[in-house]
């Protein structure tokens, strides 16, 4: 079960639109701290090097300050750590966004990386849904199981309550496809979480609630 975490070294004084979540199971121990109004500061240590690299993309291109520390049963494989980092990140996003008052809510970006081109569209709708359209040609990038990309986004979507559509428009290199996906996700999320000055203090829904 998640619990509030102590302030991190990266984000010592928690401003509005920031959160810290600590999640412990028999398989993993994960701490995530983030500031949605950050500048891209990042410190991650999950024990899964390729996942660390992708989390850096989220922070850098999403302009969020992000700290992730995780230990898990990676002697078995990376699945539990990968999924639980996604769960905890999703929970931290939901906590930092609160009732989502004043945000754009929707975000969209198409990111190239050499021959790869990936489109991401998302909506902080309060209704979790993932439409996943990557065709990653290899089973692994280094030691990272490429099936875990989808599992990571399933976890983030379900626990942040977002709708997320990922489409691969081009690409043959597995690393490029995955990295373009994380970059596009970061930029789309940056657009969605920005405060719309015209919306002021209202919730971005015709229903009045998300």
From Swiss-Prot:
The keyword 4Fe-4S does not apply. GO terms for molecular function: imidazoleglycerol-phosphate dehydratase activity. It comes from Synechocystis sp. (strain ATCC 27184 / PCC 6803 / Kazusa). Pfam families: IGPD. Keywords: Amino-acid biosynthesis, Cytoplasm, Histidine biosynthesis, Lyase. One of its GO terms (biological process) is L-histidine biosynthetic process. InterPro entries: IGPD_sf, ImidazoleglycerolP_deHydtase, ImidazoleglycerP_deHydtase_CS, Ribosomal_Su5_D2-typ_SF. The gene is hisB. Its EC number is 4.2.1.19. It catalyses: D-erythro-1-(imidazol-4-yl)glycerol 3-phosphate = 3-(imidazol-4-yl)-2-oxopropyl phosphate + H2O. It is found in: Cytoplasm. Pathway: Amino-acid biosynthesis; L-histidine biosynthesis; L-histidine from 5-phospho-alpha-D-ribose 1-diphosphate: step 6/9. The keyword Cytoplasm applies. Its main location: cytoplasm. Belongs to the imidazoleglycerol-phosphate dehydratase family. PROSITE patterns: IGP_DEHYDRATASE_1, IGP_DEHYDRATASE_2. This is Imidazoleglycerol-phosphate dehydratase. GO terms for cellular component: cytoplasm.
């Amino acid at each position: 079960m998640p619990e509030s975490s102590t302030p991190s070294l990266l984000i010592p004084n928690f401003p509005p639109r920031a959160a810290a979540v600590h999640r412990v199971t028999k398989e993993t121990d994960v701490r995530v701290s983030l500031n949605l109004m950050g500048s891209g500061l990042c410190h991650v240590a999950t024990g899964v090097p390729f996942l660390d690299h992708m989390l850096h993309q989220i922070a850098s291109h999403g302009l969020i300050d992000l700290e992730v520390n995780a230990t898990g049963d990676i002697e078995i494989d990376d699945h539990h750590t990968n999924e639980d980092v996604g769960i905890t990140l999703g929970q931290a996003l939901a906590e930092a966004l609160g009732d989502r008052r004043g945000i754009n809510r929707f975000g969209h970006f198409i990111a190239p990386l050499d021959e790869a081109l990936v489109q991401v569209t998302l909506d902080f709708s309060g209704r979790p849904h993932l439409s996943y359209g990557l065709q990653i040609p290899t089973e692994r990038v280094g030691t990272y199981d490429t099936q875990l990309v989808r599992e990571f986004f399933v976890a983030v979507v379900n626990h942040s309550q977002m709708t997320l559509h990922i489409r691969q428009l081009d690409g043959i290199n597995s690393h490029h496809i995955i990295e373009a996906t994380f970059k596009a996700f970061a930029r789309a999320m940056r657009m969605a979480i920005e405060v719309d000055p015209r919306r002021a203090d209202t919730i971005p829904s015709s229903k009045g609630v998300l």
